[in-house]
From Swiss-Prot:
Alphabetic keyword roster: Ribonucleoprotein, Ribosomal protein, RNA-binding, rRNA-binding
Role description: This protein binds specifically to 23S rRNA; its binding is stimulated by other ribosomal proteins, e.g. L4, L17, and L20. It is important during the early stages of 50S assembly. It makes multiple contacts with different domains of the 23S rRNA in the assembled 50S subunit and ribosome. The globular domain of the protein is located near the polypeptide exit tunnel on the outside of the subunit, while an extended beta-hairpin is found that lines the wall of the exit tunnel in the center of the 70S ribosome.
GO molecular function: rRNA binding; structural constituent of ribosome
Annotated Gene Ontology cellular component terms: cytosolic large ribosomal subunit
Source domain of life: Bacteria
Organism: Bacteroides thetaiotaomicron (strain ATCC 29148 / DSM 2079 / JCM 5827 / CCUG 10774 / NCTC 10582 / VPI-5482 / E50)
Keyword Acetylation: no
Protein name per its UniProtKB record: Large ribosomal subunit protein uL22
């Protein structure tokens, strides 16, 4: 690794130490379905977001709820105190496409239709309100 690349990688690692996030990788649902759930809670206060996810009928909401609880626990672990209501917000959440499994399904007249079984990666950042305003 070159010197410039190493320095920028070290800066990136230091920046991540001050951020509070959780990642969920290789979720076996399509990114499009997961983005619908992510858009529901973007920018919300965490207790309200947990309520929205708990009562959502979407299958992906249960996975994002668990991820949000993990991000809150990470924040509490790094700050060595419990989060108070109204203190934490979902500052960022994004969904990236993961690996796609390609399968074939038999089709009429000897053909085969391709099936793409998609997966995704979700990254969720939490922070205080002051951090939320600084990033925007």
């Amino acid at each position: 690794m070159g010197a410039r690349k190493k320095i920028s990688a070290e800066k990136r690692k230091e920046a991540l130490k001050t951020m509070y996030f959780a990642k969920l990788q290789n979720v076996p649902t399509s990114p499009r379905k997961m983005r619908l759930v992510a858009d529901m809670i973007r920018g919300m206060e965490v207790n309200r977001a947990l309520g929205v996810l708990k009562f959502s009928s979407k299958e992906a909401a249960a996975r994002v709820e668990k991820l949000l609880r993990s991000a809150i626990a990470n924040w509490e672990q790094k700050n060595e105190r419990k989060a108070e209501s109204g203190e934490l917000f979902v500052t960022q959440i994004f969904v990236d496409g993961g690996a796609t499994l390609k399968r074939m399904r038999p089709a009429p007249q000897g053909r085969g239709y391709r099936i793409r079984k998609r997966s995704n990666h979700v990254t969720l950042f939490v922070g205080a309100k002051s951090n939320n305003e600084d990033q925007n």
